[in-house]
């Protein structure tokens, strides 16, 4: 929608709209998150953002029943000045400083669920249910020194990774899930797997272990990204752990509308393949493949693989 200059000046003459524009330039945020940051009701936020959406200054994206808003920062001195002023206002009222905390709250439910005691269940047979995963690893095997399973959970992929790689590091932020994973490793007899408690987004300590040896040949992030407030941060962190020529393999859901999964800690209801590819490229990887996985899983899964170039700086 074309906006004449006078209309744009009038639109940006409202301090509340300047705040909204600045906050959505900082992070893609839901209406509910904006309401929390500005201490207003969601209907008020919806009313105030609507004019910005109508002229294209805010881009809206659906995720199930939620709407996320992001500022469309075109090369325009007036809009740039508006965002700068909005940031000043948000810094003054404290809302800008709260953005990181609000985004982190997206993951609170999944953290509570994963740390909860699990029902006692028998350890599955070694290799049970892994046949469908075998095609994923075929193009990734030239380098077989080290694989990292980021967000290993209870170790579902470890019986496949352990025989293929000399060393495997399995990382998870849930101590409870790692304890259950350790019991499974003992039962399976997988001696070359080492468990580490931590988050892939904060990979500094892991890098100290991995990078002196040249980096990992493979980092797997399987059904993890939909639990994270900022999935792109995990992809960037994983990329930094790869050796030149190493691969990042992501398995996650295609877009779906099963809102009930939010009760199980799902922050996002799947991802568009183009979104995964965009994040892979932004992290400094060359896309190898982004495609649906031929499994009966519901919601349907997809695979995205990126390769770290030989002279990558990421």
Region spans (language model):
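A conserved beta-strand element that flanks and buttresses the S-adenosyl-L-methionine
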Residues: 220
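A short glycine-rich, Lys/Arg-flanked "PGG" loop and its adjoining helix->strand segment in the class I
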Residues: 232-247
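Amphipathic alpha-helical dimerization/coiled-coil segments
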Residues: 78-124
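Conserved alpha-helix/loop element of class I SAM-dependent methyltransferases that forms part
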Residues: 126-145
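Class I SAM-dependent methyltransferase SAM/SAH-binding core
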Residues: 148, 154-207
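C-terminal alpha-helical "lid/dimerization" subdomain adjacent to the S-adenosyl-L-methionine
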Residues: 247-305
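Beta-hairpin "wing" of winged helix-turn-helix
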Residues: 54-63, 70
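N-terminal helix-turn-helix DNA-binding core of bacterial DNA-binding proteins
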Residues: 3-41, 67-71
């Amino acid at each position: 929608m074309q906006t004449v200059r006078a209309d744009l000046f009038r639109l940006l003459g409202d301090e509340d709209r300047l705040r909204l524009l600045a906050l959505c330039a900082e992070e893609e945020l839901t209406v509910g998150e904006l309401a929390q940051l500005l201490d207003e009701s969601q209907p008020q936020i919806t009313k105030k953002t609507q004019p910005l959406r109508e002229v294209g200054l805010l881009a809206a994206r659906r995720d199930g029943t939620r709407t996320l808003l992001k500022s469309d920062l075109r090369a325009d001195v007036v809009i740039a000045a508006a965002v700068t002023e909005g940031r000043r206002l948000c810094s003054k009222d404290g809302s800008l400083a709260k953005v990181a905390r609000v985004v982190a709250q997206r993951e609170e439910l999944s953290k509570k669920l994963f740390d909860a005691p699990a029902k006692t269940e028998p350890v599955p047979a070694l290799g049970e249910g892994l046949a469908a995963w075998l095609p994923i690893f075929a193009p990734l095997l030239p380098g077989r020194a080290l694989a990292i399973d980021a967000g290993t959970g209870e170790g579902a992929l470890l019986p496949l990774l352990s025989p293929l790689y000399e060393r495997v590091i399995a990382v998870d932020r849930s101590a409870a899930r790692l304890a259950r994973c350790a019991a499974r490793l003992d039962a399976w007899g997988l001696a070359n797997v080492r468990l580490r408690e931590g988050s892939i987004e904060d990979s500094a300590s892991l890098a100290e272990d991995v990078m002196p040896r040249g980096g990992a040949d493979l980092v797997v992030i399987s059904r993890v990204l939909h639990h994270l407030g900022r999935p792109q941060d995990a992809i960037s962190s994983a990329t930094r752990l790869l050796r030149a020529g190493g691969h990042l393999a992501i398995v996650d859901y295609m877009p779906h509308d099963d809102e009930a999964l939010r009760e199980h800690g799902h922050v996002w209801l799947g991802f568009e393949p183009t979104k995964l590819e965009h994040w892979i490229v932004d992290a400094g990887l060359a896309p190898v493949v982004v495609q649906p996985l031929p499994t009966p899983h519901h919601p349907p899964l997809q695979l995205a693989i990126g390769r770290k170039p030989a002279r990558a700086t990421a």
